Amino acid sequence: IVSLQKSMKAGTKIPGAYLQLMNYEDEKRPDVLYGYPNTLISYPIPGTAVPPWLAEGIAQYMYENADWDHWDTHRDMILRDRAIHDNLLTFTEMNTFGKKGIGNESTYNAGFALTTYIANEYGPESLKGIMEELSSPLQFSVNNAIMNVLGISGEDVYQDFKQAVEARYKRLVVPIEVLPVKGKSVQMDGTANLYPKWHPKKNGFAYLSNKQNDYFGQTDLFYFDLDTYEDKKIKSSVHSAPSWHSNGKMIYYSKKSKFPNKHGSRYYDIYSYDFETEKEDRLTVDARAFNPVFIEMDSSIAYLATFDGGQDIYILDLKTNESQKVTDFRDRPMISNLTYALSSHSLFFDITSHHFRDIYEYSISDESLNKKQDHDLYDERNMTSNEAGLQIFSQDKSGIFNLYMSNPADTSEGYITNVTGGAFMPDISENGKVIYSLFENG
């Protein structure tokens, strides 16, 4: 915001202006003050001419010793994936939003990377100079503004940046491409296929997908039959991971109510869908609830709910339909990806308190809270386990998110994927099959 204010051409009190001209037909009668308008010309003059990539890039770029934001593995994954597939946004494409899938996110990431490149090559003060140049009343071209400050056009700076990025990433993925390990792709429609969950009785899985929709967050709930390759939509506008009932006849998920409450608000709540009756039931009301997990032993559903800027774990008793809050995180961290471990009768979940996610475990039996994967320098997330206690999660220790296996029974552990993009959201069946969401050529 400070940088954008610095680039405004007439200060914050005049964000923009219009040159307008209106003309009217001649009056037809003496009692008519004006004739009918026949000309309307309006020419906008923007008070700010900063493209999205530069605005977002400077917002994310950190001055020396600042630690509010950083170039994380997700940003690196998106830029790397575009670079190795010769699909980097052009300089012109970076200047606008309005893209599908992760296109808008790519504008953010490429902008952060290009801004950092400019700061590293030409000094951090060059960013200030570019914003000051864009504040000039007659300067509306970022290409020319960069030329006036750096002595080289914005397009040429971008081409240098592009060559450096492509050379670096293509060199880094050579060892991975020699021995890739990613399994077999079974569903590639859409730009977001998320949270796959094995059917407990059949050879298939439920998942969320944005196929037939425009944007990443517009996801519907589907069931994919691996025997027939039939793909069926169950419900529209579903949010977060679904969870199967152990009998395979019912599935639980989160979505917003169809109609607003008396205050005009629509919140995420937990719903169930019965495949035999094709009936949907709402299990919570205005709970801001998501990520349900069925617990057969207690005939209950654990879920996450948001309040006061953070999340906590709740357990819904299906016999009484009453919810109980079982955690109370006073520092309001971000909680996500709740899963149930039958072998330990506990809940795994991701927790974010600063830059990285860690994996914690909540014991339903004794209500204790334990750290399972907790490293300061890299990210662990998306824990899943089967009845035998085999644990699989996503980890970015190598700089790329890959699936990592840990077997508490014999203390064996190691990576089970080797991908150039990113491996997330694994789910392991009782017979040891692993299904996950792969980011590749997005």
Model segments located where?
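Short loop/turn segments that connect beta-strands within beta-propeller blades
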Residues: D225-Y229, D274-E278, D317-N321, S363-E367, ...
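Ordered, small/hydrophobic-rich secondary-structure cores
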Residues: A66-L138, F205, Y215-F216, T228, ...
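A short beta-strand motif characteristic of beta-propeller blades
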Residues: V181-Q187, Y229-K235, K279-T284, E322-D328, ...
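Acidic/His/Gly-enriched intrinsically disordered linker/tail segments
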Residues: S3-E121, L134-V173, E177-L179
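Blade-terminus and WD-like Trp-Asp/Gly-His loop motifs, strongest in beta-propeller folds
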Residues: P196-G204, P242-M250, P292-S300, L338-S346, ...
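A flexible loop/linker signature enriched in serine peptidases of the S9 family
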Residues: D69-D72, D189-T191, S209-D220, K235-S240, ...
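Beta/coil-rich, acidic/histidine-enriched accessory regions frequently appended to metallopeptidases
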Residues: K100-E105, I130-K249, S272-F275
